[in-house]
Swiss-Prot record:
Listed InterPro entries: Peptidase_M76_ATP23
Record's keyword annotation contains Mitochondrion: yes
GO terms assigned for molecular function: metal ion binding; metalloendopeptidase activity
Protein name per Swiss-Prot or TrEMBL: Mitochondrial inner membrane protease ATP23
Keyword annotations from UniProtKB, A to Z: Hydrolase, Membrane, Metal-binding, Metalloprotease, Mitochondrion, Mitochondrion inner membrane, Protease
Active site: 146
A GO BP annotation: mitochondrial protein processing
Length: 245
């Protein structure tokens, strides 16, 4: 991607991309990380006896144990999507028309420590959180989301400290990437409503992203910023003619 002066390496929610990644722990006992242990943790969720800190530690270390395999799968899916995904190929072409270049050298798979599935920096490209993807479709949605961010940064004069600008970016990325389509919300988020489901999903995701940004006080404040720019940003489907999916 083209560089911009002093542009911080930021994720969509304002977090540092470097801070999202993690190194593999030096000592891990692979015997502990087996199907029986995983089943016990899942069973504890059903019985109401969860130990959340223990669960997080367990799954984080299990991811680290399998980091090479997880990142290789992410790399393979990235290469496949760059070649065969209609939405990814379209956005890649549109970014190129604006002088940018997204490819396997600047779309990088890494292990991440937080709940996000990806991040974008105009200077460094796209970060894909390999250990956060449920499947290739989830990775496709994330790539499309970050590629919309890339297009917006090249097309518009985006101010990193302007909360209205950032809210607009999140509204557009969630609307156009496909991550808020009904089938995904129905099967992964248990969102059963059909009427205005897309709008509610986009508002929810944009608000959550804004809550993590410096200068945003709380959920109410984040929602107010999203509402201020909602109409124009939700209806702006560029570079698509309409919402693709």
């Amino acid at each position: 991607m083209a560089s911009s002066p002093s542009n911080p390496e930021t994720a969509p929610d304002g977090a540092s991309l470097a801070a999202m990644t993690t190194d593999q722990p030096k000592k891990i006992d692979p015997v502990y990380y087996n199907w029986s242990s995983t089943f016990s943790i899942l069973l504890s969720r059903m019985t109401g006896s969860r130990d959340v800190p223990l669960e997080e530690k367990y799954f984080t270390e299990m991811d680290a144990l399998k980091a090479d395999t997880i990142c290789q799968r992410c790399d393979s899916n990235r290469d496949y999507l760059l070649q065969y995904s209609p939405i990814v190929r379209f956005l890649k072409d549109e970014v190129e028309k604006l002088g940018g270049d997204l490819n396997k050298d600047n779309i990088l798979c890494r292990m991440c420590t937080n709940s996000q599935s990806g991040g974008f920096s105009l200077d460094h490209g796209i970060l894909l959180c390999a250990n956060k993807f449920r499947n290739r479709g989830h990775q496709e949605d994330t790539m499309a989301h970050e590629m919309v961010h890339a297009w917006d940064h090249l097309k518009f004069k985006v101010e990193n400290d302007n909360l209205r600008h950032q809210a607009c970016l999140e509204i557009r990325a969630s609307t156009l990437s496909g991550e808020c389509r009904f089938s995904r919300e129905f099967f992964t988020k248990n969102q059963w409503s059909v009427t205005e489901q897309l709008q509610r999903c986009v508002r929810r995701r944009a608000t959550l992203s804004m809550m993590a940004r410096p200068g945003v006080r709380d959920e109410k404040h984040a929602g107010e910023i999203v509402n201020q720019v909602w109409e124009g940003c939700f209806r702006d489907t560029r570079p698509f003619d309409e919402i693709y999916r």
